[in-house]
Amino acid sequence: MANKILTPITLWSDFNDSLPIQCTVLEEREEDGVLLRKLRCFGRDVGGVRVNIFAVYCAPAGETAPPALLILPDASQTADVAFAERFAKKGYAVLMPDYRGEWENCEEYTIYPEAIPYANYRSAGRRLDFADDTAKETSWYEWVAVARYCCLYLRSLAPERKIGLIGIRAGGEIAWQLAATFEGIACAIPVCAGGWRAYRGVHKFGESTELKMDDERYRFLAGVDSQAYAQYAKCPVLMLCSTNDENFDADRAFDTFARINPEMDKTFYFAARYNGHIGKTGLNDLDLFIDKYLKGREVFIPAPVEIGVEEDEGELVARIKFDRNGEVKYCDVYMAEDNLDSPTRDWTKCTLKREDGDDEQLFTLNAYENASRVFVFAKAKYSCGFAVSSKIAVKRLENAYSNSQKKSRILYSSTNGTDSFTIDRFDRNVLADCFLNTAEPPVRLTEGPLGIRGVYSSYGLKFFRINDARFRPGENGLLKFDIYSPRPTILQVCIGAGQGGTPVRYSCALRISGGECWADHLLSAKDFKSEINKPLSGLNAARYITFYSQDEFCINNLLWL
């Protein structure tokens, strides 16, 4: 069997899911109308030893057969009771297993047989990203096997009820495999997951876009990577992705979406500027999607936005086309320039130029005059409450346009609103380490002294614009900004710098005196130090900049000199 290339069909065709599950309830309680169980059940047999699955089960108290959800967390996470309870309160029976395996200072985990130590996430090693033998001898095979037996457990409780899938990051990759190979799934929602793990570090639009192939890569691509499973999807699919995801190339997200079985309902949404996280708009999409396919609610699911880049009256524009079957409430278009590295792109909002009938709009793309290409995507929200996005469109720029922009030293002023800023730290109000669950805008304008407003986030601010050629500081540039903080605080200013791979963080701690006044600060590269106290070589090496304080503050007039 070694070196055999297995496809999604051949990999799972002989899987034995006929073994008895034998569930044991470890703990059971009822609170606020929700039944909570912690349980163990058996998974597949490995050399005469069964996988011992730990999971959390939540359901509306007193209901016998509500529609069910299998929620698969990220590989570094475990069952999240709060997240499971959220859906139980909405009328779903939820099973959320641990599949990461043995974990420090944790007793509630899935126990894998000694023959497959790589099923434990911390011991996965090469089995996570390589199929050195076959796709069966990988961590993914064992994790999908856990998920299959979890589905069997849910089915054993109520054989006729519908089962939906939600998978987060690595859990989303598992969901792709399950949606393609397990009969009876009613809908699947992979979150920040869409395959192409074999292509990590290979930019879709770079000079060298081809992967160096050998037998091992063929085995991984054929039997593990999620894009191989998309064409076999047996249920409706909602893809939720984030544009600045460090672990998944946003440029390739729509490639996976396009491969989904055309006979299945499907749609797509991008969380703008987020890194492996989804905001309340995407969470609302998720709720509507499962309501439709698990509860039978009448919900209009729009098709993804169509987008193209063209010239109009001498200007560079994006043409947006909407689903004619729905009523659009608003549309936002985002543009980035030149940067092939999708996690560090500066996505800036574009201005509506005009409407062309009921179903088309044109947005101006005010690109830098020396930019060689633009990246553009759109997202639209419909009156039904559902929001969808387009693919990331790319166009090489070979002509001059009347709306081209000159180089600028002004990175930000409050006239820009909150444009280009995102969250630095997802450290609270986050469900399942992924969904930002807050009613207020996470990045907003707040008023400071003299009626002057600045940008603020209690999660800290992150800003990629300093990485754009149009705004990039000179070799000996200085960073200047105004800050308002009503009380004394320490502001952590960090710059991520370096070429290729994960940027190195260089930090500067500023003591802010506080008070009802704006204070200006001027920083040079040498003010920023790495963890080993190495100074930043120059601001022109910056790929992003962040501002964070435990106290309230706001920033304005960010520029370089």
Model-inferred region functions:
Residues A233, M239-C241:
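Short beta-strand/loop motif that positions the catalytic acidic residue
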